[in-house]
Design a protein with these regions (language model features):
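Transmembrane helix-loop-helix hairpins at lipid-water interfaces of multipass membrane proteins
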Residues: 51-111, 184, 188, 195-221, ...
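Extended non-transmembrane interhelical loops and adjacent amphipathic helices
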Residues: 2-36, 124-171, 234-243, 247-277, ...
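An intracellular "coupling" helix at the cytosolic face of ABC transporter transmembrane type-1 domains
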Residues: 43-44, 160-173, 233, 255-299, ...
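ABC ATPase nucleotide-binding domain helical subdomain, centered on the C-loop/LSGGQ "ABC signature"
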Residues: 446, 479-525, 581, 619
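ABC-fold ATPase nucleotide-binding domain signature/coupling loops
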Residues: 506-538, 542-559, 563, 638-639
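C-terminal portion of ABC ATPase nucleotide-binding domains
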Residues: 3-5, 573, 581, 586-590, ...
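Cytosolic ends of transmembrane helices, especially the final helix of ABC transmembrane type-1 domains
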Residues: 325-362
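Membrane-integrated ABC transporters
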Residues: 1-64, 96, 115, 152-189, ...
């Protein structure tokens, strides 16, 4: 598993030399700019809602102060009211002040849930906008190269983690930021009240004490976030191991291979690798700095309280001022603690937003080094002549080995071309280049002489129906799974059924509880799952649906890997009819498949080493003939363990073993 690298940590934290100027710059980068990003997010919540919540939070900040003032005046009026009796003016004043205090208290209780409900609406709006942005960023690249970049994966993981756990999201941070309006409005009002009621120096002293407490809390969280950045890679491992053990994907192997204990130990080890850095940082982050800041703050706050008591003892302030001073200082000190509605969510959101910003920058950096996507329309009927790989070379990003080395290959229009070779020969890479999932390192892929990089990628891909061996099993209905082959056109049920019939899966699908509308997942009510071979036919039907919608190229990458030999033979007996007039590329390790192709190409070491018809290549006695004979011998002895009934393959395949022996004479 990949762990965080030094480059993943905030640069200033790792490299900044001591000095006020650098420290100030680092603080701005770490604490100020991320908060400004959160402030800018407020616009996606709606101006009216944000303004209303701001006013509401100002009110929620002032109402507790009004309650403190009212109750303090109430305490001061009690002696006069008691002396005057219930019919006195002093008693009337006492009653009026009590009603004011009660009103302030009741308004606080009424407005708080209103603020919470509106805050949730703001959170949903902001988080929804950011989810859309993150999704748009990951869908933006034309190819899949950026999606395999380790730095991009780290930033994406950090960006979406808050959304996955649904707390500490940027939307919650926006709500928490507005909540700080209430907190700091209250603090400012209390500083003024203490200054007026007790002494002007006491107000700023209490305010400074509260800010010191707050700096200790927020400073610790900010330093903790640096540690969090260092363990992002390990966090991904923890998440992965948790998913493996909590879903049914690996349930069979976990039990059959006895992996329960091993997975539990691995999970604990990964989790400890995440937690240990925090434990090591705890004393440095909290113990000494927090004790120092708390001590200074308590001295300031305690000094204000003692000064208030001295003034009351010497008669310089009355009972009202004493009550007001004590209550105001106590309420102000309570503002120096941890803010659950703001602190954690804001810190996590700053991590997410910083990761999102780095994700944008990394994608921009990767795309800047790539050729801009073409915009030309794909001519109708393309390819009319041929698809050509013209001296194509390719190396995967970050890899040292060349996968394709000057490939010269022609796929004649309307014909079936097969590509064979050992694992790692570059067969699937050809498919990725043809689908523009990658761009060639050198050379070009051409359709009727035109570089396909000049075409609009989306238009070009509509011309290509692809079946990958590792196709996706979507948790959708059977009809939707097939119709995804041409998602750009309205779903045509008749065409869906026809594609299913051609792929040999229609009968099985129609027998499901809801037919084509049955969800292909047991996670949904009335849903079911299919066998591997049935899913393979769904994938084939998906590609055939694309052909029905106008695709001109069919690419089959190990198309029958999950079918038994007889089913494979039956499928390829129909293959020529299904793909008549279609330019097709067939990749398979089974020679019983490729022998039916019009043209066969042998790849080895990233180069084309042989090409021709099946009969011609067998007669040549070269690389293809040797591999064919080796596989035929395994078929004849029933040694190909991945096929059902493989001992009878010679019958199903029309005497493949006999033909191989004949070709080797």
């Amino acid at each position: 598993m990949t762990t965080g690298t030094p480059s993943a940590v905030e640069p200033a934290a790792a490299t900044a030399p001591p000095g006020l100027r650098v420290t100030w710059s680092h603080w701005v980068d770490e604490a100020v700019r991320p908060r400004l990003r959160i402030v800018r997010l407020l616009t996606s919540g709606g101006d009216g809602l944000v303004v209303f919540l701001t006013v509401l939070n100002v009110a929620l900040g002032l109402l507790p102060v009004a309650f403190v003032v009212a109750t303090s005046v109430l305490v001061g009026e009690v002696p006069a009211a008691v002396d005057g009796g219930v019919d006195s003016a002093a008693w009337d004043r006492l009653t009026g002040i009590f009603l004011l205090a009660a009103a302030a208290f009741l308004l606080t209780q009424l407005l708080t849930p209103v603020g919470n409900a509106l805050g949730q609406r703001l959170r949903r709006r902001v988080d929804g906008a950011l989810r859309d942005e993150a999704m748009a960023l990951m869908l933006r690249p034309v190819g899949i190269g950026p999606l395999e970049d380790q730095r991009i994966l780290d930033e994406l993981s950090e960006t979406v983690r808050a959304f996955d756990r649904e707390w500490g999201t940027p939307g919650q941070a926006c709500v928490g930021l507005l909540g700080l309006v209430a907190r700091y409005t209250r603090l400012l009002a209390l500083v003024v009240v203490i200054g007026v009621a007790v002494a002007w120096p006491a107000g700023p002293a209490v305010g400074a004490a509260v800010l010191l407490f707050r700096y200790g809390q927020r400073g610790g969280l900010r330093k903790y976030s640096r540690v969090w950045r260092e363990v992002v890679g390990k966090q991904r491992e923890v998440t992965y191991l948790h998913q493996v053990t909590m879903t049914d994907v690996a349930a069979k192997e976990i039990r059959l291979f006895g992996l329960s204990g091993w997975l539990a130990d691995r999970y604990v080890a990964a989790w400890e690798a995440v937690v240990r850095p925090f434990e090591r940082a705890r004393r440095r982050v909290y113990l000494v700095p927090y004790l120092v800041l708390t001590s200074v703050g308590l001295l300031l706050a305690g000094g204000a309280m003692v000064h208030t008591a001295q003034l009351a003892a010497t008669g310089q302030v009355g009972l009202t001022a004493l009550a007001l001073g004590v209550q105001a200082v106590a309420l102000a000190i309570s503002l120096g603690g941890y803010y659950p509605e703001a602190d954690t969510s804001t810190q996590y959101a700053m991590l997410s937003l910083s990761a999102l910003q780095r994700l944008r920058e990394r994608l921009d950096e990767v795309e800047a080094g790539q050729r801009p996507p073409g915009r030309a329309a794909v001519p109708a009927g393309t390819p009319a002549v041929a698809l050509t790989f013209d001296r194509v070379g390719f190396r995967y990003p970050g890899a040292g080995r060349t996968v394709l080395d000057g490939i010269e290959l022609e796929l004649p229009a309307g014909r079936c071309t097969a590509v064979v070779g050992v694992n790692g020969a570059g067969k699937t890479t050809l498919v990725k280049l043809l689908g523009r999932l990658y761009e060639p390192t050198s050379g070009s892929v051409r359709a009727d002489g035109v570089d396909i990089a000049e075409f609009d990628p989306e238009q070009w891909r509509r011309q290509v129906g692809v079946i990958f061996q590792d196709f996706v099993r979507y948790e959708l209905t059977a009809a939707e799974n097939i119709a995804l082959g041409a998602a750009h056109v309205p779903v045509d049920r008749a065409v869906v059924l026809r594609a299913a019939e051609r792929a040999g899966i229609a009968e099985a699908l129609l027998a499901l509880p809801d037919g084509l509308d049955t969800p292909l997942s047991r996670a949904y009510p009335g849903g079911t799952d299919l066998s591997g071979g049935q899913w393979q036919r769904i994938a084939i039907a998906r590609a055939l649906y694309a052909l029905e919608a106008g695709a001109k190229v069919l690419v089959l990458d190990e198309p029958t890997a999950a079918l038994d030999v007889r089913a494979e033979a039956a499928f390829f007996d129909r293959f020529v009819e299904l793909t008549r007039g279609v330019t097709s590329l067939l990749i398979s390790h089974r020679f019983s498949s490729v022998r039916r192709a019009d043209h066969i190409v042998v790849l080895d070491g990233g180069r084309v080493v042989e090409r021709g018809s099946h009969d011609g290549l067998i007669a040549a006695g070269g690389h293809y003939a040797r591999l064919f004979a080796l596989q035929a011998e395994r078929f004849a002895h029933g040694l190909d363990a991945e096929d059902d009934g493989v001992a009878n393959a010679g019958v199903a395949d029309g005497g493949m073993a006999d033909e191989a022996r004949e070709g080797n004479r």
